[in-house]
Amino acid sequence: MRAIFAIFVIFFVVLHTDLIMTGILADVIYTEKEIAACGRNCKHLPNSRCNVANRKCCPVPQLFSNCPKGGRVK
């Protein structure tokens, strides 16, 4: 009985960990695609870069202040 229970617990832990890791990897891949799209869109604006924190094109001096005004969403 203990062996069956142990196999079940191991199977559950491995499956659960795999699902969690898959979700984390999906978030990372999706975020990288968003950042890449934002960077491509910002190339068309003069003196602008993509702010990774909020995915907006910001004038270079405002880049790290989250574009309080004038930020253009991707």
Swiss-Prot record:
Signal sequence region: 1-26
Gene Ontology MF, one: toxin activity
Coiled coil start-end: none
Subcellular location: Secreted
Gene Ontology CC terms: extracellular region
PTM annotation: Contains 3 disulfide bonds.
Tissue-wise expression: Expressed by the venom gland.
Keyword list, A-Z: Disulfide bond, Secreted, Signal, Toxin
Chief location: secreted
Family assignment from sequence similarity: Belongs to the scoloptoxin-10 family.
Entry protein name: U-scoloptoxin(10)-Cw3a
